């Protein structure tokens, strides 16, 4: 793992195996954060899980999709800070779909500060939901 915590990647692979039955023990996982950056915040978890599932199932995520959220040991997707700001930046940079923790989605829509017509917000409570909403 380059640019992120190796132990966190292993933990997320263990969550996929235990909670979703995805056989990760036989797989090698290579993770690289582009641009030489180092990202250690838990909001990266959901995107890492989606990337691992994408590779495992040999299916690409849809174009224009952004994912963020912390993943817990039982596969629950936890809220992260600065969610509204993250979505605002996603809109500015042209993303069309954002998969995020359900509690963050509800807060953003209730606040009404963002034009949610420009981006589809998909709230998830558990990593299992990625299979449907991300096409995996």
Predicted feature descriptions by range:
Residues 2-136:
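Peripheral, non-AAA+ core regions of ATP-driven protein-machinery
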């Amino acid at each position: 793992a380059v640019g992120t915590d190796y132990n966190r990647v292993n933990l997320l692979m263990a969550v996929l195996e235990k909670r979703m039955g995805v056989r990760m023990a036989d797989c090698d996982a290579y993770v690289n954060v582009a641009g030489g950056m180092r990202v250690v915040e838990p909001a990266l978890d959901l995107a890492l899980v989606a990337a691992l599932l994408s590779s495992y199932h040999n299916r690409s995520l849809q174009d224009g999709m952004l994912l963020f959220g912390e993943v817990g040991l039982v596969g629950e997707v936890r809220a992260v800070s600065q969610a509204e700001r993250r979505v605002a930046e996603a809109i500015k940079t042209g993303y069309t779909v954002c998969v995020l923790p359900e509690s963050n989605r509800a807060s953003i829509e209730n606040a009404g500060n963002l034009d949610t017509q420009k981006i589809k917000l998909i709230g998830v409570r558990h990593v299992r939901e990625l299979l449907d909403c991300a096409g995996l």
